């Protein structure tokens, strides 16, 4: 059985947040809850924990890939400066996490967030994720499963969406 490695991040920014209703990544694809975690390159502790977890999953799951770690394995932290033409990803790494199971969504005091407008792309918080090995349809790598998210503070909404309160505040 494949082994996974769990990580609770430091403060990240959430993007492409679909934590209340699952979305299909591709038309006709499986519905999943998902979020992109934007991690400052200055957050060495979170980056180190993620990289160690990924390396542990690779070592513990060689059998998933036929006994050795394949070259060109997919997964891991991605460089926002290199891959995204978006100021929200500047000086940051990112990783996409998803799950078929609905994640827990809580506030800074660990109270469940029920109001869907309270957790959004652009807010800041922490995430609990699990890294796992996969070998499916010729694609091999280390995936990132979404467990839970915790909102710690507000942030400017990403994607140009504003609330009525923001639009009409005097």
Go through each PLM region and give its residues.
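OB-fold ssDNA-binding interfaces and closely related basic DNA-contact patches used
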Residues: 1-94
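Beta-strand elements of well-folded, non-transmembrane domains
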Residues: 39-41, 131-133, 153
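Exposed beta-sheet edge/beta-hairpin loop segments within beta-rich domains
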Residues: 108-125, 132-142
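Beta-strand/loop nucleic-acid-binding surfaces
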Residues: 96-114
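Acidic, gly/ser/pro-rich intrinsically disordered tails
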Residues: 1-6, 156-170
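OB-fold/S1-family single-stranded nucleic acid-binding modules
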Residues: 136-156
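Hydrophobic residues positioned within well-ordered beta-strands of beta-sheet architectures
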Residues: 33-35, 127, 147
């Amino acid at each position: 059985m494949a082994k996974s490695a769990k990580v609770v991040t430091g403060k990240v920014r959430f993007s492409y947040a679909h934590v209340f209703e699952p979305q299909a990544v591709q038309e006709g694809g499986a519905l999943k809850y998902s979020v992109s975690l934007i991690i400052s390159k200055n957050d060495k502790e979170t980056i180190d924990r993620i990289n160690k977890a990924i390396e542990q999953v690779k070592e513990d799951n060689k059998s998933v890939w036929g006994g050795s770690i394949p070259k060109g394995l997919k997964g891991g932290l991605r460089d926002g400066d290199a891959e995204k033409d978006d100021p929200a990803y500047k000086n940051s790494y990112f990783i996409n996490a998803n799950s078929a199971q609905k994640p827990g969504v809580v506030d800074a005091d660990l109270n469940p967030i029920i109001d869907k407008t309270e957790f959004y792309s652009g807010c800041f918080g922490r995430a609990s994720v699990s890294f796992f090995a996969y070998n499916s349809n010729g694609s091999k790598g280390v995936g990132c499963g979404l467990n839970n998210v915790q909102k710690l503070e507000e942030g400017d909404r990403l994607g140009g969406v504003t609330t009525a309160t923001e639009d009409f505040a005097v």
